[in-house]
Amino acid sequence: MAVAAVGRPRALRCPLLLLLSLLLVAGPALGWNDPDRILLRDVKALTLYSDRYTTSRRLDPIPQLKCVGGTAGCEAYTPRVIQCQNKGWDGYDVQWECKTDLDIAYKFGKTVVSCEGYESSEDQYVLRGSCGLEYNLDYTELGLKKLKESGKHQGFSDYYHKLYSSDSCGFITIAVLFVLAFAVYKLFLSDGQGSPPPYSEHPPYSEHSQRFASAAGAPPPGFKSEFTGPQNTGYGASSGFGSAFGGQGYGSSGPGFWSGLGAGGLLGYLFGSNRAATPFSDSWYHPAYPPSHSGAWNSRAYSPLGGGAGSYCASSNADSRTRTASGYGGTRRR
């Protein structure tokens, strides 16, 4: 009897040792000691990037950040990095709070953290680095207000920004200066040969004509010959600028007074428009008036059309206003 009692514990030890040996062999094969196998409840925080993908074991990798819809749409704004913090266990799964800097026109809608289960979609353990965030991007009240305003004036706003963009300001300035220089040349410096002489009721060599011509004097060097020529305006004759403008008004086919007037008007419009803010910009920058004099000979001069500090072309280069936005959601295993 004593021998039988001693033999039973030895017989029980053999199955236990065999089971322990099997566990030691099968454990690593099942991934129990794999450092990539982690309990999701132990994860405190996730930092996710828009240009990176998750790790994968059973399935294909997915983007760490993925927009899946919302009232604003996925093309409206793309956050570069989002951090999600573990806020606790609700009895079913981990709950998350995700934060990032968003434009004030947008906010998070529905958010969910998606992780790859290590063995299956029901596994409490997940693959390390396999978590990503799926989110909706919605408009805030301010964003909806801006959307309605831009919808009413979309055509004019697009045209205004294209016309006064930083790329087009330099070209427009050069073109206007070229037209203005050409108009001045044709108006004052070019001695046209094809235009008929100005009409006068007196013969060109009469005493009346010669008297006024001598009173006007010779034209300045480089100016038109008819710059000071006689012209009948109803009060006798006129000279100087009156004659120059009057002479162009009688049948002259070349550019003259009207081309100069048009070029001046265009230049004035350009200068005036550049001082005005865009009609739908909330953060337009108005440069301060320049000082009355400069303290040094090489100090930067104020230029309303330049590209230096305090100068601008009408373009959307103002920094957009942002604030920290939060989204809340649970977990989905895949």
Curated annotation (Swiss-Prot):
One Pfam assignment: SARAF
Entry GO terms, CC: endoplasmic reticulum membrane; endoplasmic reticulum-plasma membrane contact site
Signal peptide: 1-31
Location within or outside the cell: Endoplasmic reticulum membrane
Cytoplasmic topological intervals: 190-334
The entry's keywords: Calcium, Calcium transport, Endoplasmic reticulum, Ion transport, Membrane, Signal, Transmembrane, Transmembrane helix, Transport
Region: Disordered, residue numbers: 198-219, 310-334
Ranges of compositional bias, category Polar residues: 313-325
GO BP terms in the entry: calcium ion transport; regulation of store-operated calcium entry
Domain of life per record: Eukaryota
Membrane topology term: Single-pass type I membrane protein
Primary localization class, coarse: endoplasmic reticulum
Lumenal compartment spans: 32-168
Membrane-spanning segments: 169-189
Domain observations: The cytoplasmic C-terminal region mediates interaction with STIM1, while the N-terminal lumenal region mediates regulation of SOCE activity.
Family in the record: Belongs to the SARAF family.
Function of the protein: Negative regulator of store-operated Ca(2+) entry (SOCE) involved in protecting cells from Ca(2+) overfilling. In response to cytosolic Ca(2+) elevation after endoplasmic reticulum Ca(2+) refilling, promotes a slow inactivation of STIM (STIM1 or STIM2)-dependent SOCE activity: possibly act by facilitating the deoligomerization of STIM to efficiently turn off ORAI when the endoplasmic reticulum lumen is filled with the appropriate Ca(2+) levels, and thus preventing the overload of the cell with excessive Ca(2+) ions.
Assembly behavior: Interacts with STIM1; the interaction is inhibited by the interaction of STIM1 with EFHB.
Name of this chain's protein: Store-operated calcium entry-associated regulatory factor
Species this protein is from: Mus musculus (Mouse)
